[in-house]
Amino acid sequence: MGESARGGGSAETTGGLAAAVKTYLEYTPTGESIPAAAWRRRHRNVRVFVLAHIPLLLALGLYEGTESAVTGATIPPTPGILIAAELGIVGALVGLASIPSVSRRGRTALASTAVLASSVVLVQFSGGFIEAHFHFFVGMAVIAVYEDWLPFALGLVYVVFTHGVFGMINAERVYNHTAAINNPWVWGGIHGAFVLLLAGALMANWYSTERSREASQKRLEEARQKAQQVEDLEARQAEIEAEKAEAKRLKADAEEAREAAEAQQREVAALNERLEATANTYGAAMARAADGDLSVRLDPDVENDAMAAIAASFNEMLDETETTIREIQAVASDVAAASEDADAGVVEIEDASGQVSETVQEIAAGADEQREKLETVSGEMTDLSAAIEEVAASADSVAERSHETAAVAGDGEQTAEQAIADSRTVQSAVESTVQNVEALDDQLAEISEIVDLISDVAEQTNMLALNANIEAARADKSGDGFAVVADEVKDLAEETRASAGDIEALVADIDAQMQATVTEARTADESVQDAISAVDAVVDAFGTVAENAEETDTGVQEISTTTDDQAASTEEAVSMIAEVSDISTATAADAQQASTAAEQQTTAAATISENTAALREQADRLQGLVSTFDVHDESASTAARSE
């Protein structure tokens, strides 16, 4: 029984321990509870903290010897390559921790490693002073701002690993006492244990803080929920009060609506009574109108719009009916009077119709005689028109020939003017040729002078060659070569003089030919000038011919036009005479028809007389019928409507 109890207690203890461990792990911070803005601010401060170490560590690494002013510590020398490498590693870690694309925990790990690396560099550059190891604990406190267990785990591993490894490589730069120098891994573990204890203490504090924070959050959330419930209750109470006020308002509106309905019911009853009285009055008036009293009217000044509209429409109908009856009465009177007048007029028509018939027969006989005379005139006018047309045709032919003459004269004048232009071009060319030949003559004179100069030079060269031969003869054998050259020069001079003579003769021939050319050109120029004068005379003659031909053409054209107009007028007169003849024929026929119509009119007048008598009887009956209706006087009715 006791063993069972102990077994149960052991199980409870084991279960409680597991629950405690689970709870501890749940509240182990990971840094995720820190807001992003706060985390960025803390991360920036950690990086600034590490970067502030670099100039101090550089100064410590470069220092060598015993510092006697304050500490009395002896600092060993540090190779420059080691200083650069280790400070470069610290700076690189800070740079990597600043890259935004790296995850948040990745940058946390890099910044924490940079802090611990600066602690390692401080210990090495100081020569392993135990006081420098305190910087590890400072670094652990700094990275605690991340509130994450990962930096602590990195710190623990980093402290043990660096103390053990660097203690094996150069223990004197890590530790400054013999025990640690001889056992670097043991003392590295001791440092790690202290770091672990520090981390445990901080994490225990975080655990308590997280528990307190969670409890505070729960209480705050509960307070918020209660405040929200209070606000909801207050809002609900306000809604209830509003609903009560709305219910009271609706009740008051219902009372007002009931009272209004009762009042409206009373008004409807009174209105029905007034409508019934108005309907009785309207019925009596309509009965009088049905009996023929068209002067009766309904009173439109009533309360009901429909009854007022009925009264207005009925009054308007009676106004129109009364006006119509009044007009019928007037028309009946007018018809009776007109019937009497028509009866008297019909008698006069019968007498006039006989006279018209006789007159029309006389007109028909005159129209036949006029037609015969017009036919004779039309034949004579036709012959005259044919003669005028022959004259017009001859005038057209003459006009066409005169027009052709004027055109030929114009073409001849243009051709003569073109010949003058061509002659002037030839004259310009001849003058240019004369000028060119004269210029060539001047150049030949210059060539002649040059040939004379060449002849003089050849003569002088010949004299020099002769003198050279004389000098060569005097020089005996030594002048043989000189004599040969002198002979060649002499021969060349002779050839030059001969060529100059030929050129001079040729220039003389050319000069003679050019003189002849100039003479012929001047003669041609004079001939061209004479031709231009002759052609000018021809142009003037053609101009005169063209003007005369144009005047002739104009006159003939006017004659032709006048003749055409006469022919057209004659044809038009013939046509008009034919039309007059046709009109005379038609007039005779119409006169015959008018005579027949006059006879028919006489017969119709008798019929009209009979119909007029019947119409007078109908008008009397109509007056008797409309006299049964009572209507207002027209002037009085108009005055009443205007009012």
UniProtKB/Swiss-Prot annotation:
Sample GO molecular function, one term: transmembrane signaling receptor activity
HAMP domain residues: 273-326
Entry coiled-coil feature ranges: none
Entry comment on modification after translation: Methylated by CheR.
Mode of membrane association: Multi-pass membrane protein
Residue ranges of domain Methyl-accepting transducer in the record: 345-581
InterPro entries, per database record: Chemotax_Me-accpt_rcpt, HAMP_dom, MCPsignal_dom
Gene3D superfamilies, per the entry: Methyl-accepting chemotaxis protein
Compartment list: Cell membrane
Gene Ontology cellular component terms for the protein in this record: plasma membrane
Regions crossing the membrane: 48-68, 79-99, 115-134, 149-169, 184-204
Keywords, in A-Z order: Cell membrane, Chemotaxis, Membrane, Transducer, Transmembrane, Transmembrane helix
Matches recorded under PROSITE patterns: CHEMOTAXIS_TRANSDUC_2, HAMP
A biological process term (GO) from this entry: chemotaxis
Function in brief: Potentially involved in chemo- or phototactic signal transduction.
Family: Belongs to the methyl-accepting chemotaxis (MCP) protein family.
Protein name: Transducer protein Htr8
